[in-house]
Amino acid sequence: MIEPAIERRHNLALIKTLTYVMFMMFAMTTDSVGLIIPEIIKTFRLSLTAAGTFQYATMAGIALAGLFLGQLADRFGRRPTIVFGLTLFAAASYLFVAGESFPFFAVLLAISGIAIGVFKTGALALIGDIAKSTAEHTAIMNTVEGFFGVGSIVGPAILARLLADGISWKWLYVLAGSICALLIVAATQVRYPRTMKATSETVGLNRTIRALKNP
């Protein structure tokens, strides 16, 4: 009895750590856009307003995923949703190296935003599953914010170093994509907790229909 309990705690700790690192990895790119925009302006001779599309595209993707894809975690499960988001993000990140046009980059940023949004629907649902109390849920979310903050520092720092050495900003996305690939492998190896499919709404609706038929 003791060994399975220890194994469960160890597995849960791995899940939490992976989730924290995933949020940190996403922050590395989303919070580096401010440094990339001046490079985009120089390369494509754009106005600041036009170059701002780099920021809008990512956020629009996140918003669209949150509004229209929020049910994926309940429909397909936490792990598949998280892995799908990570895979989509990794693919978009690697494609930056192949791009040479501003519209192409903007589309990739929108796709990466959708990927982040999909990931977040799965990750936030997972956090709700593994938290045993409101206090624990708050603690996990605070740690997530902390790791996101670390990524917000590390990403721009790496990008600044790349630019100082004359290396294209695209390689930050390659780095993020590589980290993402490692996280995908790790996520497929860890045992995620089982989640019950949401049926309460259906049951409630069926009861209401029966009640209307039999007043």
What are these model-derived regions, one by one?
Residues I2-H10, Y192-P215:
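Juxtamembrane intracellular "pre-TM" segments in multi-pass secondary transporters
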Residues L14-K42, L46-L48, K120, L124:
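Extracytoplasmic
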Residues L18-T19, P103-L109:
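Short hydrophobic/alpha-helical segments at membrane-entry points of transmembrane helices
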Residues D31, T58-L67, I153:
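Residue-level signature of mid-helix packing/kink "hotspots" within the transmembrane helices
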Residues L64-P103:
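Conserved MFS/SLC helix-loop-helix module at the cytosolic interface between two early adjacent transmembrane helices
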Residues F102-F104, T143-R191:
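Helix-loop-helix hairpin linking two adjacent transmembrane segments in secondary transporters
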Residues L108-G146:
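Cytoplasmic helix-loop-helix junction between adjacent transmembrane helices
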